[in-house]
């Protein structure tokens, strides 16, 4: 195993532990707690893949971080922090919407770029609204937390979510996953509308009618790639 991979995992485990302490002391907000839960799943998946114990990795990460802080001058730390842009957290969905359980009559799923696309293909002739919670860096979607598709009545009919055991995803991965989801839902004559935040930060444009800017041919092509759930 590459030593950098081990070091990265150890530091991630220790930083997650520090964030957990903040949460336990009620020193953080809801988006912080939401990311904390998802990152915990991701670390468990990575630990299983790498064959590393989380507690041992956390202790190793603590030593690494402490050594860095001891050797780093305060002035250098201030400069590094000031020059690093802070991501923003965009929330289309409420805590209830993002955590609600949902079920599929005709399940379909596909993995693409570290993301899981799930949809209920029993849904027909509905107006579907796409909502997402994600972080933004440099005015562009950085990390997707969750994207869900809702009917006008509020029922959840599809979802895109990161796979904890797989590495991160890019903006293009998210756009491709949304294209697959749209294609699958439009195959059954559903009308899709994406939130303004999704359009702005994923595609960098705004569509007045709320429709995502994907050409019909791409939607149909992606729809054919959606495979039955095993």
Swiss-Prot record:
Region (CPSF4-binding): 180-215
Region named Disordered: 206-230
Region annotated PABPN1-binding, chain positions: 223-230
Short sequence motif Nuclear localization signal: positions: 34-38
Keyword vocabulary terms for this entry: Eukaryotic host gene expression shutoff by virus, Host cytoplasm, Host gene expression shutoff by virus, Host mRNA suppression by virus, Host nucleus, Host-virus interaction, Inhibition of host innate immune response by virus, Inhibition of host interferon signaling pathway by virus, Inhibition of host PKR by virus, Inhibition of host pre-mRNA processing by virus, Inhibition of host RIG-I by virus, Inhibition of host RLR pathway by virus, Interferon antiviral system evasion, RNA-binding, Ubl conjugation, Viral immunoevasion
Compartment(s) of residence: Host nucleus; Host cytoplasm
GO molecular function, one term: protein serine/threonine kinase inhibitor activity
One GO term (biological process): symbiont-mediated suppression of host type I interferon-mediated signaling pathway
Listed Pfam families: Flu_NS1
UniProt modification remark: Upon interferon induction, ISGylated via host HERC5; this results in the impairment of NS1 interaction with RNA targets due to its inability to form homodimers and to interact with host EIF2AK2/PKR.
Record has Ubl conjugation as a keyword: yes
Region annotation RNA-binding and homodimerization: where it falls in the sequence: 1-73
CC annotations in GO: host cell cytoplasm; host cell nucleus
Motif Nuclear export signal, residue numbers: 137-146
Subunit description: Homodimer. Interacts with host TRIM25 (via coiled coil); this interaction specifically inhibits TRIM25 multimerization and TRIM25-mediated RIGI CARD ubiquitination. Interacts with human EIF2AK2/PKR, CPSF4, IVNS1ABP and PABPN1.
Free-text comment about domains: The dsRNA-binding region is required for suppression of RNA silencing.
Function, in words: Inhibits post-transcriptional processing of cellular pre-mRNA, by binding and inhibiting two cellular proteins that are required for the 3'-end processing of cellular pre-mRNAs: the 30 kDa cleavage and polyadenylation specificity factor/CPSF4 and the poly(A)-binding protein 2/PABPN1. In turn, unprocessed 3' end pre-mRNAs accumulate in the host nucleus and are no longer exported to the cytoplasm. Cellular protein synthesis is thereby shut off very early after virus infection.
Family (UniProt): Belongs to the influenza A viruses NS1 family.
Protein name per Swiss-Prot or TrEMBL: Non-structural protein 1
Gene behind this protein: NS
